[in-house]
Design a protein with these regions (language model features):
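Secretory targeting and sorting signals
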Residues: 1-30
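Intrinsic-disorder/low-complexity accessory segments
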Residues: 29, 33-134, 139-185, 199, ...
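Short helix-loop-beta-strand segments that form the rim/entrance of peptidase-like active sites
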Residues: 169-177, 190-232
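Acidic/His-rich structured neighborhood in mature extracellular/periplasmic domains
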Residues: 183, 239-241
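Short, solvent-exposed turn/loop segments enriched in Gly/Ser/Thr/Pro and often Arg
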Residues: 218-227, 269-275, 709-710
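Gly-rich Lys/Arg/Thr-decorated short loops/hinges at beta-loop-alpha junctions or inter-strand turns
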Residues: 232-238
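Caspase-like (clan CD) cysteine peptidase catalytic core
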Residues: 246-255
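Proline-aspartate-enriched helix->loop->beta-strand connector
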Residues: 258, 262-272
Length: 843
C-alpha cells in the first residue's frame, strides 16, 4: 500500500467547533486540515449575515466602456475608469488597487496589438470584470478559423484528431484566474506583470508563444472582495465553492470564460500556504475524470512549477507542498467540482490551484508592520508569477500533447468509453488510494408529465445543465427507455457526450467516502438529481434512439389549469412556488393556506396568478372547497448565514437581518412575523428590552431554527422540549430521510443535505417529527464518520428525528437538524423552509 508522506504546514487554522446541546461527553472534532477553511464554521453559525445592500459601494465609474471591433484580434475596449478609492485594502500591501487596473489596461491597449480586453460582467456592487487576451494579431478570417477548430475539438473530436490544419494552426488556450478570494491579492499583480510583459516584449520566445497560443487572464475574479479585503464577495459567498450552483454573477462569468475559451491548461491563484502549495491534489480524486489524461501532465508541470518557485531563492518558498505527493487522503482532495480548478478539469483543462506562501490577510493584515506586509506581498507576487511563467513555457513545449489530450477527453466522452485502469506507479507516487472511477450510465431522463415531481424544478435543472455546456435533448414524441415509458417533452441527457464527466458529476448520487479518507477538505456530497427537486431517472444501459431536438432553454412550465371562476391552488413544492406566493402577497392579493400547505388564490385574482405563473414557471390548479387560514405578506427577521439570507431572498421573502447586537441596539420586531435563527443570535445574551421584544414575537408569530446556534436558541428561550444531539462536526453529504409523519413538510423530497448534522431526542409532549433520518446508515453520498468515542456517527442518527415542529409560548416552532439552504445549493429543499415560514406565520 502506497502511503504519501505528511507535510506539516505552519498555518493558523480555525479548529472545528460545534456547540453541543446534549449531555453526551465532549469530544474533540478531527483536527483541521492545514490551510483548511471549515465548510460549516463560524461564518455560518456564529456571525449573522448583514444586508449586502448596506455594504460600502464604491463611487460609480466615469463614463461607459467603449468596445471596438470584435471580428478579429486584438479586441480592444476603452475601459471606463473608477474614481480613486483610498480605502482599497490592496494599497497597504503595495499592490494594485482596483481603480488603477482599468487605466493600466487602457495604456497597454494603446501600446500593443497583442492585447485584447473585454468586460465580461459586473460584480454584485457593479465593478467590471476584465478578461484579457494575449495573442498574436488575427484577421477576422483567422479568428473564425480558430473558433471553428475549437468547436471541432468538442463537437467532433474524432475529426479534430485527424485535422492537419488544426494540428498546425490551432492556438492552444491557457486561462489564468486570479483573486477569486478577495483577500488573496497577489495573483492579480502577477497577472498584470505578465500581461505587460507579453504585450510589450521583443523576446522572440514570447512572440512564438503568442503565435501558437491564446493566453487568457481573469485579472481579478472578485473585485469587491479585493477592495474590501474579504475572502467572500459582496454577497458573502466563497466563490470557490459556487461552481456547480452559480448563484453569483462573478461565478457565472468565470463559468462562461472556461466554456468559451476551452483552455487546455489553467491556473487558479490563491494564498496562503507556508512554503507554497501547487496541485495536483491528493485523493480522493473526482471519480468522473479521465484521470490518466490529467495526471500525466498535471504532475509533470506541477513539479516544474515547484522547481521554478524554489529557484527564486526565497527561504520562505523552499518547502513547496504538492498535495498529490505530500499529503494523505482528505487533507487537500480534488473530489468536488465546486472549486475552480476541479470544475475546469471537466471542460478539458489540466488544472491547478496555486497557494502562495506568506500570509498577509486577516490578523496578519491588521497586526504586521506595513514594511513586512509589503515584503511578503512582493515575494508572493514573484511566486505567483513564477507559476504563470512556468506554465506558459510548459504550454509552448507541450502544445501538441495538451491539445491532443483535450481532444481525447472529449472523444472518450462522446464514444461512451470506460475510464482507464491506472496501475500503481502510473506516475511516481500513484497508488491504490488514488484510484477513483465510476460506471457511467447510458442516459438520464428528466420526465415530463405525471412522472415529474416538479416541472418547475425540472426546467431549472435543464437550464443549469445547458448553461454548463452539458448536452440535453427534448423528446418530440413519446418513447420507451430503460423499461419506462415517457411522454413527449421529456428531457434526455445522453451520456455519450464530450463532457459526460461533468454531466455525471452533477446528476449521479455520488459516493460514501467515509472509508476512503479520515476527513475531507470541504463538502463530499452533492447531487442535482437528488437535491434540486426534479424527478430524474437513470438508464443504465441500452440503445438511445429517441426522436428529439437539442435544448437551448427549457420549455415554459407555467400556467393556470383551473376553469374560469374557480379559486386557484398552488402546492409549494419548490422555491419557485414560494417566489410566486410571495410575489402575489407583495401585490396585496389575499391568499389562504390550507392545512396541507396548499396556497389558495381567489378566482378574482386569476390575471395576477397567470402573470406570476409565467414569471416563475409554476402551475395553478383548481382549489379544493376548503376555507384555510389567511396568509399575508410575511416579514422574516433572520439571524442567519449569508448563503441562507441569499436563499430566503431568492424565494422572495421580506427578510430583515438581525443578530444579538442589532436586537440589543433596539431593533424593532413589532412588524416581524417569523424569527429565523441559525447564526449570531443568543437568547441568553439579549438585554431585557430585546428579550421582551422576542418574547412578544413568540406570542404572535413563528420561529424557525437551524443547526447548533438555532438549537441553543430554542433551549435558552424555553421553546420546544427536545434535546439536540450533534453529529460529528465535519460530517456532510446527502442523506436518505423519511417524511411519512410530516405535516408542515408534507411532500418533501426523500433526500436531504447535512453539514454538522443534528438530530433530536427526548421529545416532549406536543412535539411532532416532521422528518427522520432513514434507518440503518442514512448517508447516501458524502463523508460521515463517528467521533473518536463512537458518538456522532450516521448509525447513531439512524431513525432519529431530523426536523421537528410544535408550539410553545404561543409560537409555532420548527427546528432543522439538516441544511436545507446550504450555500444556496439544494434548491429542492428550499420549499421546506418556505413551508416552515408560512406555517409559523399563519394562525
Amino acid at each position: 500500500m502506497h502511503v504519501k508522506r505528511r507535510v506539516l504546514l505552519a498555518l493558523t487554522t480555525a479548529a472545528l467547533a460545534v456547540t453541543s446541546l446534549t449531555a453526551a461527553p465532549a469530544v474533540a472534532d478531527p483536527a483541521a486540515v492545514p490551510g483548511r477553511d471549515f465548510g460549516n464554521g463560524p461564518e455560518r453559525n456564529e456571525v449573522a449575515a448583514t444586508d449586502p445592500v448596506a455594504a460600502k459601494r464604491s463611487a460609480g465609474p466615469l463614463g461607459e466602456n467603449k468596445a471596438g471591433v470584435r471580428q478579429g484580434y486584438p479586441r480592444k475596449t476603452q475601459l471606463r475608469v473608477y474614481p480613486e478609492d483610498t480605502t482599497d485594502k490592496s494599497i497597504k500591501l503595495g499592490l494594485t488597487p482596483y481603480h488603477a487596473i482599468a487605466p493600466r489596461l487602457n495604456a497597454l491597449q494603446a501600446r500593443s496589438d497583442r492585447i485584447s480586453v473585454e468586460v465580461v460582467g459586473q460584480t454584485g456592487l457593479g465593478r467590471d470584470l476584465y478578461l484579457v487576451t494575449l495573442t498574436a494579431p488575427e484577421t477576422a478570417r483567422e479568428t473564425r478559423q480558430q473558433d471553428a477548430w475549437r468547436a471541432l475539438i468538442e463537437n467532433d473530436p474524432v475529426r479534430a484528431a485527424r485535422d492537419k490544419g488544426l494540428e498546425r494552426g490551432y492556438k492552444a488556450p491557457v486561462w489564468i484566474n486570479n483573486n477569486i478570494h478577495g483577500n488573496e491579492w497577489e495573483g492579480t499583480d502577477a497577472a498584470l506583470r505578465q500581461i505587460e510583459y507579453l504585450a510589450t516584449t521583443n523576446d522572440p520566445a514570447a512572440k512564438r508563444l503568442l503565435a501558437t497560443s491564446r493566453v487568457y487572464f481573469n485579472v481579478t475574479a472578485n473585485p469587491d472582495g479585493r477592495v474590501a479585503g474579504t475572502r467572500a464577495n459582496s454577497a458573502g459567498f466563497d466563490m470557490n465553492r459556487d461552481f456547480v450552483t452559480n448563484t453569483q454573477p462573478e461565478n457565472r462569468a468565470m463559468r462562461d470564460m472556461i466554456i468559451d475559451t476551452q483552455p487546455v491548461i489553467m491556473l487558479d491563484e490563491h494564498g496562503y500556504v507556508a512554503g507554497t502549495l501547487i496541485e495536483p491534489t491528493g485523493p480522493p480524486h473526482g471519480q468522473n475524470y479521465d484521470f490518466d489524461l490529467y495526471i500525466k501532465h498535471g504532475y509533470t508541470n506541477g513539479l516544474e512549477m515547484e522547481k521554478a518557485v524554489q529557484g527564486l531563492g526565497y527561504p520562505e518558498a523552499q518547502e513547496v507542498v504538492v498535495p498529490f505527493r505530500d499529503l494523505p487522503p482528505g487533507e487537500w482532495d480534488g473530489w468536488p467540482p465546486i472549486f475552480t480548478a476541479q470544475y475546469a478539469m471537466y471542460h478539458g483543462a489540466v488544472s491547478y490551484t496555486i497557494e502562495i506562501p506568506l500570509r498577509v490577510n486577516n490578523a496578519a493584515y491588521d497586526q504586521l508592520p506595513v514594511e513586512e506586509l509589503r515584503r511578503r506581498s512582493a515575494i508572493n507576487t514573484d511566486v505567483s508569477e513564477a507559476t504563470m511563467k512556468t506554465t506558459l513555457a510548459y504550454l509552448y513545449r507541450h502544445r501538441d500533447e495538451l491539445v491532443d489530450n483535450q481532444i481525447e477527453i472529449f472523444r472518450r466522452g462522446a464514444a461512451g468509453e470506460a475510464q482507464r485502469y491506472l496501475p500503481d506507479g502510473f506516475v511516481p507516487g500513484f497508488g491504490p488510494e488514488d484510484r477513483f472511477t465510476t460506471e457511467f450510465p447510458r442516459a438520464y431522463v428528466i420526465p415530463a408529465g405525471s412522472g415529474q415531481r416538479s416541472a418547475t424544478a425540472a426546467a431549472r435543472l435543464v437550464d443549469l445543465l445547458v448553461d454548463h455546456d452539458v448536452r440535453v435533448r427534448q423528446a418530440t414524441r413519446p418513447f420507451t427507455l430503460g423499461g419506462r415509458s415517457y411522454p413527449a417533452g421529456s428531457y434526455l441527457v445522453d451520456m455519450h457526450q464530450p463532457k459526460r464527466g461533468l454531466a455525471n458529476a452533477m446528476l449521479e448520487a455520488g459516493k460514501d467516502l467515509s472509508n476512503d479518507a479520515p476527513q475531507m477538505y470541504d463538502i463530499a456530497g452533492w447531487s442535482h438529481r437528488l437535491l434540486w427537486g426534479a424527478s430524474v431517472d437513470i438508464v443504465k444501459q441500452g440503445q438511445v434512439r429517441v426522436p428529439s431536438r437539442d435544448v437551448v432553454a427549457a420549455s415554459p412550465t407555467g400556467g393556470v389549469d383551473a376553469a374560469p371562476g374557480r379559486d386557484l391552488a398552488l402546492r409549494v413544492l419548490d422555491g419557485k412556488d414560494a417566489s410566486a406566493v410571495n410575489d402575489l402577497l407583495g401585490r396585496g392579493v389575499e391568499l389562504r393556506r390550507l392545512a396541507d400547505g396548499t396556497v389558495v388564490v381567489p378566482a378574482a385574482e386569476r390575471a395576477a396568478a397567470a402573470e406570476v405563473a409565467d414569471r416563475y414557471g409554476v402551475r395553478f390548479t383548481s382549489a379544493p372547497n376548503e376555507q384555510g387560514s389567511p396568509l399575508r405578506r410575511v416579514t422574516v427577521a433572520a439571524a442567519v448565514s449569508a448563503d441562507e439570507l441569499f436563499a430566503l431572498r431568492e424565494m422572495g421573502f421580506d427578510v430583515r437581518p438581525v443578530s444579538t447586537a442589532t436586537l440589543n441596539a433596539g431593533y424593532d420586531l413589532s412588524r416581524v412575523d417569523v424569527l429565523m435563527v441559525s447564526s449570531g443570535l443568543r437568547y441568553d445574551q439579549l438585554v431585557p428590552a430585546a428579550k421582551a421584544q422576542v418574547d412578544a414575537l413568540f406570542a404572535r408569530g413563528g420561529v424557525v431554527t437551524r443547526g447548533a446556534t438555532g438549537s441553543r436558541f430554542n433551549a435558552d428561550a424555553g421553546l420546544l422540549p427536545v434535546t439536540a444531539v450533534p453529529g460529528r462536526g465535519d460530517a456532510n453529504g446527502i442523506v436518505d430521510v423519511d417524511n411519512s409523519g410530516a405535516s408542515v413538510l408534507a411532500g418533501s423530497t426523500p433526500q436531504s443535505f447535512v453539514y454538522s448534522p443534528q438530530w433530536f431526542v427526548n421529545l416532549g409532549a406536543g412535539v411532532r417529527v416532521e422528518q427522520r433520518y432513514a434507518p440503518g446508515n442514512p448517508l447516501v453520498a458524502g463523508h460521515w464518520l463517528p467521533n473518536d468515542d463512537g458518538s456522532g456517527g450516521p448509525t447513531q442518527a439512524s431513525g432519529q428525528a431530523a426536523v421537528v415542529s410544535g408550539e410553545a409560548k404561543g409560537a409555532r416552532v420548527l427546528m432543522f437538524g439538516t441544511e436545507p439552504m446550504f450555500r444556496a445549493h439544494p434548491k429542492g429543499l428550499f420549499a421546506q423552509v418556505a413551508a416552515a415560514i408560512y406555517w409559523g406565520a399563519t394562525r
